[in-house]
């Protein structure tokens, strides 16, 4: 293992202790909540235990280092019917760039239902419509440091709008993707949404900083096999909530149909998830369609996610 490899792993691992120091002081201390919502139907169907899976173009959302698995010009478009009549659309393209690197571009757009303005003097409504929403634009670069270890970096511009007022911020993600050499066992880590405090009007707030550690391996078969059974376990440490854990699984049959399931521990509104995927051949290329369902508490309608992706 090279010096730079050891340095990157050491820097990422030391952040675990920083997250753990304030275990009981973290709830509700960040903004830009839409960044916590999983955009990909494949990842959501696996309970978001995806950091060490991340072998398709949606890796840009979960582990930019995983973009080194991309060998052509790939794309993905995703739609989520979220709670309270809100929705999320996202898209990403990625391609090889340089001898050992890959480049990715992505966007996320979060839209809420318009609502009527109310004031102290007019609590029933003024007749004026208020619009609100969020957007994130990102550029990512992934590089193979060795045959087994990849490093990823993502810079992201985020903006939140409520009527005429805006909050803006720049964030950075740092991640690793390590292929152990034992079967297809993979270890991965990411620090997400690193950046300075943002400001909305006169109020300052922190970004939803996360540090995730994940391991994944196929118990049966491997990618492209007639039958593959993949399992994944992930720990998520956050600055604004207690530690959380994700378990996920994915089964591919004939490298054509996928069935997925997962469970998210210590979430207020979510627990189990299920999903499915279909791979279609189009000439020498392929199109993959994914769908996912997340179980929510009784107060909210369960969100549905749809994704379509492929290569050129």
Predicted region positions:
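Subset of outer-membrane beta-barrel
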Residues: 21-312
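Sec-dependent signal peptide recognition
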Residues: 3-10
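Hydrophobic h-region of N-terminal signal peptides that target proteins for export
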Residues: 11-19
């Amino acid at each position: 293992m090279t010096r730079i490899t050891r340095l990157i792993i050491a820097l990422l691992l030391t952040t675990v202790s920083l997250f753990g120091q304030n275990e009981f002081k973290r709830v509700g201390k960040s903004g830009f909540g839409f960044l916590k919502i999983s955009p990909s139907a494949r990842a959501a169907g696996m309970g978001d235990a995806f950091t060490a899976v991340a072998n398709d173009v949606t890796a840009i959302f979960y582990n930019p280092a995983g973009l080194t698995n991309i060998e052509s010009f790939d794309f993905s478009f995703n739609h989520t019917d979220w709670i309270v009549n809100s929705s999320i659309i996202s898209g990403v393209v990625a391609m090889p760039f340089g001898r050992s690197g890959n480049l990715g571009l992505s966007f996320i757009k979060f839209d809420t239902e318009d609502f009527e303005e109310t004031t102290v003097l007019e609590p029933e409504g003024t007749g004026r419509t208020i619009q609100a929403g969020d957007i994130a634009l990102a550029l990512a670069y992934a590089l193979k440091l060795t045959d087994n270890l990849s490093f990823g970096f993502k810079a992201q511009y985020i903006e939140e709008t409520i009527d005429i007022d805006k909050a803006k911020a720049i964030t950075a993600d740092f991640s690793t993707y390590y292929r152990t050499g034992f079967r297809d066992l993979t270890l991965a880590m990411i620090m997400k949404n690193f950046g300075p405090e943002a400001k909305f009007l006169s109020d300052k707030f922190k970004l939803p900083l996360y540090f995730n550690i994940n391991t994944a391996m196929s118990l049966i078969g491997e990618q492209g096999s007639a039958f593959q059974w993949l399992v994944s376990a992930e720990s998520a440490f956050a600055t604004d909530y207690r530690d959380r854990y994700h378990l996920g699984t994915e089964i591919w049959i004939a490298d054509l149909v996928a069935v997925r399931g997962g469970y998210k521990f210590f979430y207020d509104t979510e627990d189990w998830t299920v999903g499915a995927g279909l791979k279609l051949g189009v000439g020498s290329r392929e199109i993959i369609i994914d769908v996912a369902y997340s179980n929510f508490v009784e107060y909210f309608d369960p969100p549905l996610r749809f994704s379509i992706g492929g290569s050129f």
